[in-house]
Amino acid sequence: MPNPFFSIIVPSYNQGQFLERCLKSIINQKIKDIEIIVIDGGSSDNSVDVIKKYESYLKYWVSEPDSGQSDAINKGLSQCNGQIINWLPCDDYLEHGSLNRIQKIFNNKNIDIYCGS
């Protein structure tokens, strides 16, 4: 997919119990213009099983030892092509429709600056 609007990096390590909810929250945004990248730090729990379950929705995923969350995010950044890049910790999730709202704001030519948390 060339130049998607959103790139979402999901760093993960032994968080399989949260990972499925996180991935579903991204997939259920119903946005086609998105790439999902999962960087797993070599988990020993069920994380890889969860990742494989959603593999068809992912642009890229890897499960290998890393040096922590910052390293995972940097690995994910190297795979991103989106105009807007976000990382979503695997124990967090997106509210329904949140990416649609962000996309609408960024496409509004009357808005010069937007800040949120």
Language model region names:
Residues 1-117:
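Nucleotide-sugar donor-binding/catalytic module of glycosyltransferases
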